[in-house]
């Protein structure tokens, strides 16, 4: 997989364009998510999702894949806040066939990894993908995009004015409920 990562991401650096901002960061470094149990979640992250995990603190561990960006998973027990599918983490795979294979594996291993929901595979917003809700009510999108989506999104630039309405009522994802 290292080869595929290096083929897809030839240049992983995006120079900041923040000359006029108050904060002048050099990188978006991390995000956070909650989990019931680090031990149970780590099994899912490593064995199913293929993420690298390091427990760097008693209540937390970091996960990453492919880039030097990480997610901090924090064990909060029963205080977990279930997420909506619009709050999800995306994992890119090498082909549509790989999306289909992983979708079948997700269904086959729902009980083993305590996967709560596996949604159908769809072609949407330019990617072939499906969503799954993990044991901690976090959502993951397994997707294939022919190219590197991050580069294309930013290279294409704004397609709509900030004065255009968001048309929130058309977001069918708002109707997808967590299993909580």
PLM regions with names:
Residues 3-17, 52-87, 93, 132, ...:
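Conserved short beta-strand elements that form part of the metal-binding/catalytic scaffold
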Residues 24-27, 82-86, 124:
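Short glycine-enriched loop/turn motifs at secondary-structure junctions
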Residues 2-39, 89, 148-180:
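N-terminal beta-strand motif that seeds the catalytic metal site of vicinal oxygen chelate
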Residues 58-59, 119, 150:
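Residue-level "edge-of-site" marker
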Residues 35-39, 90-139, 147, 167-180:
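Vicinal oxygen chelate
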Residues 36-52:
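Amphipathic alpha-helical segments
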């Amino acid at each position: 997989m290292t080869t595929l990562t290096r083929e897809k991401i030839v240049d992983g650096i995006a120079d900041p364009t923040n000359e006029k901002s108050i904060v002048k960061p050099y990188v978006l470094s991390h995000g956070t998510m909650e989990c019931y149990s680090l031990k149970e979640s780590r099994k899912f992250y490593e064995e199913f999702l293929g993420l690298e995990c390091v427990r760097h603190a008693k209540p937390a561990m970091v996960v990453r894949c492919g880039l030097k960006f990480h997610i901090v998973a924090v064990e909060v027990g029963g205080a977990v806040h279930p997420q909506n599918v619009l709050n999800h983490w995306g994992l890119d795979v090498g082909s549509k066939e790989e999306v289909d294979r992983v979708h079948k594996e997700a269904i086959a291993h729902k009980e083993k990894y305590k996967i709560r929901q596996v949604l159908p595979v769809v072609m949407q917003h330019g990617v072939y993908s499906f969503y799954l809700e993990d044991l901690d009510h976090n959502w993951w999108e397994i997707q294939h995009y022919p190219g590197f989506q991050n580069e294309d999104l930013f290279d294409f630039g704004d397609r709509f004015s900030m004065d255009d309405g968001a048309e929130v009522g058309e977001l069918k994802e708002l109707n997808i409920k967590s299993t909580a």
